[in-house]
A protein has these predicted regions:
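Amphipathic alpha-helical dimerization/coiled-coil segments
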Residues: 1-5, 23, 76-100
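N-terminal helix-turn-helix DNA-binding core of bacterial DNA-binding proteins
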Residues: 4-45, 68-80
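Single-residue recognition of alpha-helix boundary sites
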Residues: 29, 60, 85-87
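Alpha-helical residues within the helix-turn-helix
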Residues: 37, 54-55
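Short, hydrophobic-biased segments on the C-terminal half of alpha helices
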Residues: 50-51
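Beta-hairpin "wing" of winged helix-turn-helix
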Residues: 55-71
Length: 100
């Protein structure tokens, strides 16, 4: 069962649009509209790819704390595949963050 789950997650990530979604969410939670703007995907294409990522256990949807009508997408960081994959397309290799 674990192998099937891992295979499902890797298959979900084997598509450039879905990797772009994961990379965008690596920087923080986004609403579907914000995510569409950031990745340049139409709403119907984005909905399809989010469905695939959600069914693979890589992305979760949560309601806004302040306004229950709005939803946000977040990465399932507890999934080791997300932790190993997310953000690789965000910053060039060797980039560093300095806190002052």
């Amino acid at each position: 069962m674990i192998e099937a789950s891992r295979a499902h997650a890797h298959a979900a990530l084997a598509e450039p649009h879905r990797l772009a979604i994961v990379d965008a969410l690596a920087l923080g939670d986004l609403s579907p509209g914000e995510l569409g703007e950031r990745t340049g995907q139409s709403s119907n294409l984005l909905a399809h790819h989010l469905g695939v990522l959600e069914s693979a256990g890589l992305v979760r949807r949560r309601r806004s704390d302040g306004d229950g009508r709005r939803s946000y997408l977040t990465l399932a960081w507890e999934n080791p595949i997300v932790a190993a994959t997310a953000g690789h397309g965000v910053a060039p290799h060797g980039a560093r963050v300095v806190f002052v």
